[in-house]
Amino acid sequence: MQVNAILFDVQSIQKYIFANNKLKANVGASYIVDRLFEDVLCKDVIENIGIEVDTTSWLTRSDSITSLSKPVYVAYIGGGNALVLVDNEHESLVQDIVKKFTTQVLIKYPGLKVGATKGSITLDGTQFSTDLSQLYKQLKANQFTLNPIVHPANTGLTTICDFSGDVADTVQSFGKDKRLVATSFTSKFEAFEAANTRLKKNLFNTEAIDWVFPSELEDLGQNKSTEKSKTGINDIAIVHIDGNNMGAHFRQCKTLEERSALSKRVAAKTLESFKALIEWIIAKYDILDEHLELAENMLPIRPIIVGGDDITFICNARIAVQASHYLMQQLLSDANGMSISSCAGIAVIPTSYPFFRGYEMAEQLCDSAKSKMRAYNASHEVNESCWMDFAFLHGETAPTLEQFFANEYSSVTENMHFGPYRVYGATDKNTTSDMEALVQLLDCTIQFNEGAVMAQNKVKELRSVLQDNEHMWTVFLEQLRNTGKSMPKVAGWDMFREKLWTKVNNKMRTPYVDAIELMDYILPGLE
């Protein structure tokens, strides 16, 4: 049986979510994207077209579709896509549904891009997958040929919204103050409360909790004053974690039911893992409260995207690497028969740094980790591995990650950034022999902080020595030996301990600069 099909997608999701420098708007935008198809497509459009429809049974369906129970049937929602099936007697509704949905999105959520394509699908196990793949290809092709205008035009005579950069065309209240802002900003900002309510229910199963998630970037526990100087403690971190090879996993699904079931399992695993992270933070709260300047019951983390295999959150920079490490291990654990390997990018930025630029760097760092993952998997003939990369951004940064590392980590010998680093499962014993394992880097950083292997002033001197030539490395190591000190003893790092730099895969490398930079960005007791 062949029926009409409409495939929708949400485009430029990250740009829509992070195109503001107001945390409430970022959180609200994520909620809008996540609920778009259920709230607008299903409730506002399909359920009001005047005929019998089915918008919910896909949530519990386990058997294959052989016929439509209602003239209009929502077959699948997930991963930024929605598939709607329409029987042949009501083919005229296809264009009407697309028109009404896109119009509603433009009116309610200006700035949000959605795409749509139509075709036919055969409700047959083998042909169904082929037809659906063709729809996805067509939808992808449309992205390169259609570029809808979703913002009011800036004529040069209009006021610009301070928060979004769009044309300011409405008024928004901020406490006792009122500001002229863009409607695109207002729709996101006003969705914050609904997003916050759902977050509490998802993570704590109730709204009645004492714990508070920050609603402002300044509330993440940054240390406003410290005896140390140039520590960067007033920083936040943007963390982007993405599942590995998920597209390939979904392409292996031969039926819509398989795709839907996999989507639900992935989403459940992601939420379960993030819940575990929040529980870990609460369990360590005494340590956090000691080192961070947190308001009462304020958590130093705010999730922005927790959906599918995609997680983005902001947190206090001093817990970013350790929290991300724990979360990736939770994703990797095979509890309930589901394991997700992932890669992470962490951009550490000043609180006042442009938020979207920070997110772009986090995304590039995640891509860097994925590139390392693909190369490692191919050379070691393994299917899965997890990697993390990070960078510390201060002042003006280069437009690309490669240029940033070239500018900030250059030396006489080679680039001084050693990452990305491999993340192993909590019970994996192979980590002890891998020089690229994140736990080795953390071990070195902890030893630097404890001061037993060498004095703090020698650690600071080490960074400049690493930028210099081999003669200076030798002199530095000799000075350490003469004072009864040494480089940290780290499993798998014997070659670095002897010479500071060594050749790895035909390129001179050193991990010590990363370890030095991490010293102010890990907390004792979070291991």
Residue ranges and their predicted role:
Residues M1-E527:
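Regulatory and interdomain segments flanking nucleotide-handling catalytic cores
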